[in-house]
Amino acid sequence: MVHEYDKTLKVCLVRSLIGVPSRHRLSVRALGLSKVSDMRKVNDTPQVRGLINKVHYLVRIQD
């Protein structure tokens, strides 16, 4: 049985963190990203979706 949370998303950092508010930097770090073009697979949960929504202008999402 596949749960909604078993899905994963690929998140890629596409913009630099220079000049970005500190809260947004922390959100990017919570996603496991640190350098431009870093890519991580993260679980598709409401918490992760909230982090991505907060920094949507810094990241690119692939299914």
Swiss-Prot record:
GO cellular component term of the entry, any: cytosolic large ribosomal subunit
Listed SUPFAM superfamilies: Ribosomal protein L30p/L7e
GO MF term set: structural constituent of ribosome
Keywords, alphabetical: Ribonucleoprotein, Ribosomal protein
Classification via Gene3D superfamilies: Ribosomal protein L30, ferredoxin-like fold domain (3.30.1390.20)
Alphabetical GO biological process terms: translation
Family membership noted in the UniProt record: Belongs to the universal ribosomal protein uL30 family.
Self-association state and partner proteins as the record states: Part of the 50S ribosomal subunit.
Protein name (Swiss-Prot/TrEMBL): Large ribosomal subunit protein uL30
Native species: Xylella fastidiosa (strain Temecula1 / ATCC 700964)
